[in-house]
UniProtKB/Swiss-Prot annotation:
Domain of life of the native organism: Eukaryota
This protein's name: CASP-like protein 1E2
PANTHER family linked: CASP-LIKE PROTEIN 1U1 (PTHR36488:SF8)
Regions that span the bilayer: 29-49, 84-104, 112-132, 164-184
Length: 190
Protein backbone atom coordinates (compact mmCIF):
# COMPACT_ATOMS: atom_id res chain seq x y z
CA UNK A 1 0.00 0.00 0.00
CA UNK A 2 2.74 2.38 1.01
CA UNK A 3 4.63 1.46 -2.17
CA UNK A 4 1.66 2.51 -4.36
CA UNK A 5 1.54 5.92 -2.65
CA UNK A 6 5.21 6.50 -3.45
CA UNK A 7 4.66 5.58 -7.10
CA UNK A 8 1.72 7.97 -7.35
CA UNK A 9 3.78 10.70 -5.75
CA UNK A 10 6.66 10.06 -8.13
CA UNK A 11 4.26 10.09 -11.06
CA UNK A 12 2.79 13.39 -9.90
CA UNK A 13 6.25 14.86 -9.40
CA UNK A 14 7.29 13.67 -12.86
CA UNK A 15 4.19 15.25 -14.39
CA UNK A 16 4.91 18.52 -12.59
CA UNK A 17 8.52 18.41 -13.81
CA UNK A 18 7.39 17.84 -17.40
CA UNK A 19 5.00 20.80 -17.18
CA UNK A 20 7.74 23.07 -15.78
CA UNK A 21 10.15 21.94 -18.49
CA UNK A 22 7.50 22.48 -21.16
CA UNK A 23 6.67 25.94 -19.86
CA UNK A 24 10.39 26.84 -19.75
CA UNK A 25 10.74 25.73 -23.37
CA UNK A 26 7.67 27.78 -24.23
CA UNK A 27 9.18 30.85 -22.56
CA UNK A 28 12.46 30.27 -24.39
CA UNK A 29 10.72 29.89 -27.74
CA UNK A 30 8.64 33.02 -27.11
CA UNK A 31 11.75 35.00 -26.20
CA UNK A 32 13.61 33.78 -29.28
CA UNK A 33 10.70 34.73 -31.53
CA UNK A 34 10.62 38.15 -29.81
CA UNK A 35 14.37 38.54 -30.41
CA UNK A 36 13.87 37.57 -34.06
CA UNK A 37 11.13 40.18 -34.50
CA UNK A 38 13.07 42.91 -32.68
CA UNK A 39 16.31 42.40 -34.61
CA UNK A 40 14.49 42.16 -37.94
CA UNK A 41 12.52 45.34 -37.19
CA UNK A 42 15.63 47.23 -36.02
CA UNK A 43 17.63 46.30 -39.12
CA UNK A 44 14.72 47.16 -41.42
CA UNK A 45 13.83 50.47 -39.75
CA UNK A 46 17.42 51.72 -39.85
CA UNK A 47 18.11 50.23 -43.28
CA UNK A 48 15.23 52.02 -45.02
CA UNK A 49 15.68 55.39 -43.26
CA UNK A 50 16.45 57.94 -45.97
CA UNK A 51 15.75 61.61 -46.69
CA UNK A 52 16.66 63.79 -49.66
CA UNK A 53 16.66 67.53 -49.26
CA UNK A 54 17.89 70.64 -51.06
CA UNK A 55 20.45 72.36 -48.85
CA UNK A 56 21.66 75.93 -49.43
CA UNK A 57 25.40 76.36 -48.95
CA UNK A 58 27.02 79.78 -48.86
CA UNK A 59 30.62 79.46 -50.07
CA UNK A 60 31.53 83.13 -50.35
CA UNK A 61 29.61 85.84 -48.49
CA UNK A 62 29.32 88.06 -51.58
CA UNK A 63 27.81 85.34 -53.80
CA UNK A 64 24.31 83.89 -53.55
CA UNK A 65 23.97 80.49 -51.82
CA UNK A 66 24.46 77.34 -53.83
CA UNK A 67 21.55 74.86 -53.68
CA UNK A 68 22.70 71.24 -53.51
CA UNK A 69 20.48 68.17 -53.37
CA UNK A 70 21.75 66.02 -50.50
CA UNK A 71 20.61 62.64 -49.24
CA UNK A 72 20.94 61.20 -45.75
CA UNK A 73 21.03 57.40 -45.62
CA UNK A 74 22.07 54.92 -42.96
CA UNK A 75 24.55 53.39 -45.40
CA UNK A 76 26.56 56.65 -45.37
CA UNK A 77 27.53 56.17 -41.71
CA UNK A 78 29.68 53.19 -40.76
CA UNK A 79 28.20 53.00 -37.24
CA UNK A 80 24.71 52.65 -38.71
CA UNK A 81 25.93 50.03 -41.19
CA UNK A 82 27.49 48.17 -38.26
CA UNK A 83 24.22 48.32 -36.31
CA UNK A 84 22.26 47.04 -39.33
CA UNK A 85 24.79 44.23 -39.82
CA UNK A 86 24.72 43.25 -36.14
CA UNK A 87 20.93 43.11 -36.17
CA UNK A 88 20.94 41.06 -39.38
CA UNK A 89 23.47 38.62 -37.88
CA UNK A 90 21.43 38.33 -34.67
CA UNK A 91 18.24 37.82 -36.68
CA UNK A 92 19.84 35.05 -38.74
CA UNK A 93 21.34 33.41 -35.66
CA UNK A 94 17.98 33.54 -33.90
CA UNK A 95 16.21 31.89 -36.83
CA UNK A 96 18.83 29.13 -36.93
CA UNK A 97 18.74 28.63 -33.15
CA UNK A 98 14.93 28.37 -33.22
CA UNK A 99 15.15 25.73 -35.94
CA UNK A 100 17.85 23.76 -34.11
CA UNK A 101 15.99 23.88 -30.80
CA UNK A 102 12.73 22.83 -32.47
CA UNK A 103 14.42 19.89 -34.20
CA UNK A 104 16.18 18.69 -31.03
CA UNK A 105 13.15 19.03 -28.74
CA UNK A 106 13.71 16.26 -26.22
CA UNK A 107 17.28 15.33 -27.15
CA UNK A 108 19.15 18.45 -26.05
CA UNK A 109 22.67 17.54 -25.09
CA UNK A 110 24.96 19.50 -22.83
CA UNK A 111 27.13 20.36 -25.86
CA UNK A 112 24.17 21.82 -27.75
CA UNK A 113 23.10 23.85 -24.72
CA UNK A 114 26.64 25.18 -24.34
CA UNK A 115 26.84 26.16 -28.03
CA UNK A 116 23.50 27.97 -27.79
CA UNK A 117 24.61 29.69 -24.57
CA UNK A 118 27.83 30.90 -26.21
CA UNK A 119 25.93 32.04 -29.30
CA UNK A 120 23.48 33.97 -27.15
CA UNK A 121 26.38 35.60 -25.27
CA UNK A 122 27.97 36.67 -28.55
CA UNK A 123 24.63 38.17 -29.65
CA UNK A 124 24.40 40.14 -26.38
CA UNK A 125 27.88 41.59 -26.98
CA UNK A 126 27.22 42.37 -30.65
CA UNK A 127 23.84 43.99 -30.03
CA UNK A 128 25.11 46.16 -27.17
CA UNK A 129 28.12 47.25 -29.26
CA UNK A 130 25.85 48.04 -32.22
CA UNK A 131 23.57 50.07 -29.98
CA UNK A 132 26.52 51.98 -28.56
CA UNK A 133 28.02 52.77 -31.95
CA UNK A 134 24.73 53.90 -33.50
CA UNK A 135 23.78 55.89 -30.39
CA UNK A 136 27.07 57.79 -30.44
CA UNK A 137 26.61 58.80 -34.07
CA UNK A 138 22.91 59.51 -33.49
CA UNK A 139 23.74 61.89 -30.63
CA UNK A 140 26.37 63.55 -32.80
CA UNK A 141 23.75 64.09 -35.49
CA UNK A 142 21.23 65.36 -32.96
CA UNK A 143 23.49 67.77 -31.04
CA UNK A 144 26.53 68.26 -33.28
CA UNK A 145 29.99 68.89 -31.83
CA UNK A 146 30.97 72.50 -31.17
CA UNK A 147 34.63 71.64 -30.53
CA UNK A 148 35.22 70.46 -34.10
CA UNK A 149 32.47 72.67 -35.55
CA UNK A 150 30.23 69.81 -36.68
CA UNK A 151 26.72 71.07 -37.17
CA UNK A 152 23.52 69.33 -36.10
CA UNK A 153 22.48 67.01 -38.93
CA UNK A 154 19.03 66.34 -37.48
CA UNK A 155 18.23 70.03 -37.84
CA UNK A 156 18.46 69.59 -41.61
CA UNK A 157 17.44 65.93 -41.96
CA UNK A 158 14.76 65.69 -39.27
CA UNK A 159 12.73 63.00 -41.04
CA UNK A 160 15.79 60.80 -41.40
CA UNK A 161 16.60 61.13 -37.70
CA UNK A 162 13.02 60.39 -36.66
CA UNK A 163 12.90 57.34 -38.94
CA UNK A 164 16.27 55.97 -37.79
CA UNK A 165 15.83 56.61 -34.06
CA UNK A 166 13.42 53.70 -33.30
CA UNK A 167 16.08 51.17 -34.33
CA UNK A 168 18.15 52.02 -31.24
CA UNK A 169 15.60 51.01 -28.57
CA UNK A 170 14.64 47.98 -30.68
CA UNK A 171 18.27 46.84 -30.73
CA UNK A 172 18.62 47.53 -27.02
CA UNK A 173 15.48 45.49 -26.25
CA UNK A 174 16.80 42.64 -28.39
CA UNK A 175 20.05 42.68 -26.40
CA UNK A 176 18.09 42.52 -23.14
CA UNK A 177 16.02 39.59 -24.47
CA UNK A 178 19.26 37.78 -25.33
CA UNK A 179 20.53 38.48 -21.80
CA UNK A 180 17.44 36.75 -20.40
CA UNK A 181 18.02 33.87 -22.83
CA UNK A 182 21.58 33.54 -21.48
CA UNK A 183 20.14 33.26 -17.96
CA UNK A 184 17.65 30.61 -19.13
CA UNK A 185 20.43 28.71 -20.92
CA UNK A 186 22.63 28.81 -17.80
CA UNK A 187 19.78 27.49 -15.63
CA UNK A 188 19.31 24.53 -18.00
CA UNK A 189 22.95 23.47 -17.77
CA UNK A 190 23.40 20.71 -15.17
Amino acid sequence: MEHEGKNNMNGMEMEKGKRELGSRKGVELTMRVLALILTMAAATVLGVAKQTKVVSIKLIPTLPPLDITTTAKASYLSAFVYNISVNAIACGYTAISIAILMISRGRRSKKLLMVVLLGDLVMVALLFSGTGAASAIGLMGLHGNKHVMWKKVCGVFGKFCHRAAPSLPLTLLAAVVFMFLVVLDAIKLP
